[in-house]
Amino acid sequence: MEGAKRADANLLTDTGTESSPRSPVCSLRHFACEQNLLSRPDGSASFLQGDTSVLAGVYGPAEVKVSKEIFNKATLEVILRPKIGLPGVAEKSRERLVRNTCEAVVLGALHPRTSITVVLQVVSDAGSLLACCLNAACMALVDAGVPMRALFCGVTCALDSDGNLVLDPTTKQEKEARAILTFALDSAEQKLLMSTTKGLYSDAELQQCLAAAQAASQHIFRFYRESLQRRYSKS
């Protein structure tokens, strides 16, 4: 818990439609979010974390092919498009992780025999891409009015060779890391919805990273709320 307290002390405290940049007293890069950017999807959002940017579009609930129909809930699909080229193994893996997270919070039983499709376009990848994809997906689902039991966010942690924890790492920090851990958490109880890891770490380091991610999630959810409040107060 000591590691979590240290991490929490270094987190952002002022958030809004755009948050402050990373500084010696801030462990997260700056955030920015804009919703309702695209006309064709039912909901859309652009999410920026530092220089990592993802554009998300949500289609549905809509009619679904009989072959994909699920009688008691909506069929949820996630499509991730890289900045350049065709989707590969990494994109397919991230699609599965984002889909699993969305399925854990979307109230699909309210729209049986329909489809909800989340399309993610990578605009730029400067580290913590999966976390940014999760955050963009959440804000696009909110914009589309898809019913959810809670919001969710993604947080990436990196452990360097000395065991130091870095939240929201850049590409350079990821390359130098001994381990990279990404968590998806809900807004109701900071409950763990999904986790994926790469590299070597101890059980104690895993718990330290999870505690730091849970602390960081509170600030991301505050950013969500203030971003939404600013948007709807203008309309």
Swiss-Prot record:
Keywords annotated in UniProt:
Cytoplasm, DNA-binding, Exosome, Nucleus, Phosphoprotein, rRNA processing
Coiled coil (residue ranges): none
Pfam families reported for this sequence:
RNase_PH, RNase_PH_C
Q: What is its main location?
A: nucleus
Its localization reads: Nucleus, Nucleolus; Cytoplasm; Nucleus
Q: Where is this region: Disordered?
A: 1-21
GO CC terms for this protein? cytoplasmic exosome (RNase complex); cytosol; euchromatin; exosome (RNase complex); nuclear exosome (RNase complex); nucleolar exosome (RNase complex); nucleolus; nucleoplasm
Which InterPro entries does the record match to this protein? Answer: ExoRNase_PH_dom1, ExoRNase_PH_dom2, ExoRNase_PH_dom2_sf, PNPase/RNase_PH_dom_sf, Ribosomal_Su5_D2-typ_SF, RNase_PH
Q: Which residues carry this modification: Phosphoserine?
A: S20, S23
Can the keyword Nucleus be found in this entry's annotation?
yes
* Molecular function via GO: DNA binding
Q: Where is the composition biased (Polar residues)?
A: 12-21
* Biological process, per Gene Ontology: defense response to virus; DNA deamination; mRNA catabolic process; RNA catabolic process; RNA processing; rRNA processing
This chain's function reads: Non-catalytic component of the RNA exosome complex which has 3'->5' exoribonuclease activity and participates in a multitude of cellular RNA processing and degradation events. In the nucleus, the RNA exosome complex is involved in proper maturation of stable RNA species such as rRNA, snRNA and snoRNA, in the elimination of RNA processing by-products and non-coding 'pervasive' transcripts, such as antisense RNA species and promoter-upstream transcripts (PROMPTs), and of mRNAs with processing defects, thereby limiting or excluding their export to the cytoplasm.
Spell out the family assignment given in the record's similarity comment: Belongs to the RNase PH family.
User: Quaternary form?
Assistant: Homodimer. Component of the RNA exosome core complex (Exo-9), composed of EXOSC1, EXOSC2, EXOSC3, EXOSC4, EXOSC5, EXOSC6, EXOSC7, EXOSC8 and EXOSC9; within the complex interacts with EXOSC3, EXOSC8, and EXOSC9. The catalytically inactive RNA exosome core complex (Exo-9) associates with the catalytic subunit EXOSC10/RRP6. Exo-9 may associate with DIS3 to form the nucleolar exosome complex, or DIS3L to form the cytoplasmic exosome complex.
Question: Could you identify this protein by its name?
Answer: Exosome complex component RRP46
The protein's organism comes out as Mus musculus
